[in-house]
Amino acid sequence: FYWVGDGLYREKITTELEQFSNFKWLSRMKYPDEVKDFLSEIDIYALITGMDTAPLTLKEAQLMQKPVIATDVGGVNEMMENNQNGFLVKEGSSKDVIDKIKILINDKELSLKMGESGRIFVEEIFSWEIIAKKFLDSISNYIKNEK
């Protein structure tokens, strides 16, 4: 079990988890090489937060075909499809997080399917070409409506 990153709760969480021999806190990682290496090693990506609005790491994990478990806060629910490429969990529900982790650990086929689905989702929704086209369409519509 790896914990990556920092934040308001790091000290409280790491103090609690250090009692387990399979826990390792990796601190912050150098981008992009360490992040890519880390994502290639893990089986499940969990983004358990109360404050991220649209975390890039979520898309990175999906592009690496990792099933995602993420807290349903901010814009996270727009960055994935619940029960398709991962699971959204209620903020503060550790039981829900544990239940979803168990599902993915016990069902490798589902885990692989969700990982692949996440990659496809990000490529179809968040590619630079698609984002640029949507942006240009928005600007074009705005200009047309201003005349």
Report each predicted region and the residues it spans.
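Short hydrophobic beta-strand element within catalytic cores of glycosyltransferases
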Residues: 67-70, 80
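Short alpha-helical donor nucleotide-sugar binding micro-motif in glycosyltransferases
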Residues: 37-42
